[in-house]
Amino acid sequence: MKIIQSFWSGNNDCLKDGYGWLSPIYHYASWILSCNQLRKYYDDVILVTDRAGYDVLIDNLHLPYTNVIVCLDELSKYSSNLWALAKIKAYNALDEPFIHVDGDVFAWDKFDGCLGEHDLIVQNIETTTDYYRMMWNEIRPSINVLPEAMEDYDQNVSHKAYNMGIFGGNDILFIKDYCKQALEFVDLNLEQVNKLQGINFNIFFEQVLLHELATRNDKDVATYIKEDIGDNEYQGFADFDNVPEDRKYLHLLGFYKKIPTVCNKMLAYVIKYYPEYIMRLEKLLSLAPIITELGQDTTHNKMRTEMLSYKESVLKGELETSSKDRNIMFRDIVSKLLSCMKEKSQSEVLMMNLLPKRELIMS
């Protein structure tokens, strides 16, 4: 099974924009973790990106993708707020069964077994509550051309969507038709929707539209997570304390990206398991080293304030922990790692030499 991921710079400064995260360091730590975890379980993991994304994720961070397709520069006419267009382009890029995985999804096991012979696979089905309905009511005046498939949702008859933290399937013809209709939905209303600020139109031309089309066409849709979850009720999807024993799948969607504790637990995990990538990230963002000897003074800038606060709390024993001993031990291990990672510099060079060669496809 081919796995794909997509990153679009959105005409923004890749080194300064947090892309929904508290800061760039967390954003790229997420990519480090997501890609490397996927490579543990899959031999073919493809990145779809633009030239700026290639420069950061491949040339600088050396993420271990097996192939890279550079085609998202063609999205330059769109507002960066329409970030799901990059996913739509990625879905349309392959002509064989695939699963797309968001860059804020982390897996500790394979998940393609759920697809089987089903037409499609998604993370889970959502019930759209007043949260989505209020957003749609704000967006609706900007929509001059409404796809026929969206009429039931528009009239408040349908109240479902798909969460597409993962999405793909075997029915490539349907997926390509869905991508065509999603792009048309945006393009036929582009002048208005390009101006939308602070309203998430992506939910509707990606998640709601897919559900409506799949329902109309009677598609057999597999769900990785079997629960029907309310659109603003995602609980436990950032539980780093319980991976990999009790949780095999995390998705730091939406609000999770703005919670310092969640971001810092993710960063601590990356420091522990992928230190060579953190060293590259420090260099890329011109940060003072995160991985230092205990007690050594470090300089820091605004971008690193939350991370350093977490590290200092751990080292001083001031951080509140759960009652589970292994959580305390995990943080203790991370703290101790800070004292020895300088020794990793030579192994980092070795790792870079061992990185697999990639096929670069430019379009």
Please give the residue ranges for each predicted region.
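Short, flexible, basic/aromatic active-site loop/helix in glycosyltransferases
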Residues: 144-157
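Residue-level detector of alpha-helical secondary structure
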Residues: 282-285, 304-312, 316-319, 330-338, ...
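Conserved donor-nucleotide/metal-binding helix-loop-beta segment in metal-dependent transferases, i.e.
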Residues: 109-139
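Short, solvent-exposed loop/turn segments at secondary-structure junctions
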Residues: 9-12, 52-55, 74-75, 105-107, ...
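Long, compositionally biased intrinsically disordered regions
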Residues: 223-303
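N-terminal anchoring/stem segment of glycosyltransferases
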Residues: 1-75, 256-262, 274-285, 289-295, ...
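A conserved donor-nucleotide-binding helix/loop in the catalytic core
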Residues: 26-28, 32-34, 73-101, 105-108
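Catalytic core and acceptor-binding pocket of nucleotide-sugar-dependent glycosyltransferases
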Residues: 154-249
